[in-house]
Swiss-Prot record:
Glycosylation, residue list: 57, 102, 125, 150, 157, 189, 217
GO CC terms of this entry: external side of plasma membrane; phagocytic vesicle
Name this protein carries in UniProt: Signaling lymphocytic activation molecule
GO biological process: adaptive immune response; immune response; innate immune response; leukocyte chemotaxis involved in inflammatory response; myeloid dendritic cell activation involved in immune response; natural killer cell differentiation; natural killer cell proliferation; negative regulation of CD40 signaling pathway
Subunit structure: Interacts (via cytoplasmic domain) with SH2D1A and SH2D1B; SH2D1A mediates association with FYN. Interacts (via cytoplasmic domain phosphorylated on tyrosine residues) with INPP5D and PTPN11; presence of SH2D1A facilitates binding to INPP5D. Interacts with MAP4K1. Interacts with PIK3C3, BECN1 and UVRAG; indicative for an association with PI3K complex II (PI3KC3-C2). Interacts with canine distemper virus HN protein; suggesting that it may serve as a receptor.
Disulfide bonds: 158-228, 164-209
Motif (ITSM 2): 332-337
Chain location of the short sequence motif SH2-binding per the record: 310-315
Keyword field contains Disulfide bond: yes
One of the Pfam families matching this protein, by short name: SLAM
Gene3D superfamilies (UniProt xref): Immunoglobulins
Amino acid sequence: MDSRGFLSLRCLLVLALASKLSCGTGESLMNCPEVPGKLGSSLQLSLASEGISKRMNKSIHILVTRAESPGNSIKKKIVSLDLPEGGSPRYLENGYKFHLENLTLRILESRRENEGWYFMTLEENFSVQHFCLQLKLYEQVSTPEIKVLNWTQENGNCSMMLACEVEKGDNVVYSWSEKLGIDPLIPANSSHLLHLSLGPQHVNNVYVCTVSNPVSNRSWSFNPWSKCRPESSVPRQWRLYAGLFLGGIVGVILIFEVVLLLLRRRGKTNHYKPTKEEKSLTIYAQVQKSGSTQKKPDPLPAEDPCTTIYVAATEPVPEPAPEPVQEPHSITVYASVTFPES
């Protein structure tokens, strides 16, 4: 092969390669519009324009794929549909539904893996049409909260740094405004921080923080003077007084409960106290006739001149102590009485 033929062959190979590359990257070179979606919700994607929908009757095959990037050569098949077979999808990925009447793809519950570039191919007898879109999912923002980072007070004026914070949300944008103001406040670099210099004329000023992303927005209002004014110590005193008042009520209730408990215990003690018995005092008295004190022989027991008298006397018994209960006892008294001689 001469040099001229070899050069012609090289030109043909280059042209064939360029043609193949242009065909392979045709979808990636399309202008794919971005469609925002709310994460976790049901989404419906319109995969074709009105002009393409009108030519759907001429199509014989529909293919929908998804790729992580527009230039990615590997795509995941989502829907494969042959129109002559009655419109029933030959293949349908789990979590999707395809509506043939308007060429829309429905995602039942969107997740992060559903993000990406969706391509739809309409094959006709002698032509092929392409359509694409980019699905971008965002988490819905939560209600913001305004916090006071720091504040200083001097000569009746107050300088304060506010921070607007959210717990959830993707690509969050912060904006500040005054509730009764016309122009929005412009923090540095559209930050979530806002620096304020307040005076007595700003007592009723209310500031609003708004957070937003492509699928949601929330706002929260705040009156900073309530945190900055010197009179802010008054509510603290009221809280202290309220706490003392409640503590006093609780103390009175506790004392009342203790008194009731003591009264109940005393009533039970009186109920079970045994019946008191009178003390019996036994007095032994001996009576003897007067006479000679000369010593006589011991008389027989039957002639004993002494007569013993037993007298039982009863006296009031003093109230004993509640505890312990003492058993009743007897006191014996011995007395000697001498009769004169007759």
